[in-house]
Regions:
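Oxidoreductase cofactor-interface core, primarily capturing Rossmann-like NAD(P)-dependent enzymes
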Residues: 2-36, 40-43, 52-55, 62-64, ...
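A hydrophobic C-terminal alpha-helical subdomain
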Residues: 2-4, 19, 220-283
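Structural motif detector for alpha-helix initiation sites
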Residues: 166, 197, 219, 268-269
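Cofactor-binding loops of NAD(P)H-dependent oxidoreductases
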Residues: 49-50, 217
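Conserved substrate/cofactor phosphate-moiety recognition/catalytic segment
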Residues: 46
Length: 283
């Protein structure tokens, strides 16, 4: 159910994943406005929150009228949490999901899909954010080590991806959490142009001034590499399912939703890569 009423902005906002890639950026943007109380929640952050410990939910939700929901991999607690959030006074839900999630199967994104469904079925105003892969996957975690080693091997082929800056995603989330007019909307958040992963690797190599080779892997070879690196089987299978979604072209579309919300174009990968390369992160 969707409510499109006009009202004052929320007096309190709970940000799940408050120390994570998008969550911490959302917190920073909201706090910079100084117009609302922002509570970043995580297992070890300012506000304790653990999906596996329901006793942590209600204390975290206390005083929150808006919620930035970053779902767990396990979908089982999501519906009950959203029900409790509504009961505690949350009237605006912003769900972080993923581009193409509506095409995902059992192997990837079950938590995100459950969060989308729970939001739609709730009585709160809801907005879904479906971003592409973040620029920051190249410099903060997922693909940082391979880039430093000079070889990025993935099972994606030549299907393009319009990578998006997590800062743009956070800016959209902050706007949607605090402004009216977004209820019942699904925003697909992409960068301004699509690049293959090989093209992204070349862009980063050029910015860093060092060689980076892209190698196309079969899904089986990619899984074997992840397991050899110590990844748990479930995580390796989830990444494999994510790339299967990409290979099918379900996240290749460039959208204008960042511009629609923010009134400006999204960041481009190339100038971002030059700026990040100057920090020495890929040296």
């Amino acid at each position: 159910m969707t409510t499109n009423s006009t009202h004052r902005g929320p007096s309190g906002i709970l940000v799940l994943g408050g120390t994570g890639k998008t969550g911490r950026r959302v917190v920073d943007r909201l706090r910079a406005t100084g117009t609302t109380t922002v509570r970043p929640a995580s297992r070890s952050g300012e506000v304790r929150f653990d999906w596996a410990l329901p006793d942590t939910w209600e204390p975290a939700l206390a005083g929150a009228e808006a919620l930035y929901l970053v779902a767990p991999e396990d979908p089982s607690p999501v519906e009950e949490f959203v029900t409790r959030a509504e009961a505690s006074g949350v009237r605006r839900l912003v769900v972080l999901s993923g581009h193409g999630i509506e095409h995902a199967g059992e192997g990837f994104g079950r938590g995100m899909a459950a969060a989308e469904e729970a939001a739609r079925e709730s009585g709160a105003e809801w907005t879904l954010l479906r971003p592409n892969n973040f620029f920051q996957n190249f410099d903060e975690d997922l693909w940082l080590a391979p880039l430093r080693e000079g070889r990025l091997g993935l099972p994606i082929g030549d299907v393009p991806e319009p990578f998006v800056d997590a800062d743009d995603v956070a800016a959209v989330a902050a706007a949607v959490l605090t402004e009216d007019g977004h209820a019942g909307r699904t925003y697909v958040l992409s960068g301004p142009r699509a690049l293959t992963f090989a093209g992204a690797a070349k862009t980063i190599a050029r910015a860093a001034g060092r060689p980076v080779r892209y190698e196309e892997l079969s899904p089986a070879a990619y899984r074997a590499e992840l397991l050899a690196q110590g990844w748990p089987e479930a995580a390796a299978d989830s990444l494999g399912a994510m790339f299967a979604l990409h290979r099918a072209g379900h996240s290749a579309e460039v959208t204008d939703d960042v511009r629609r919300v923010l009134g400006r174009e999204p960041a481009d990968l190339e100038p971002w890569a030059r700026r990040i390369a100057a920090t020495g992160v890929w040296a």
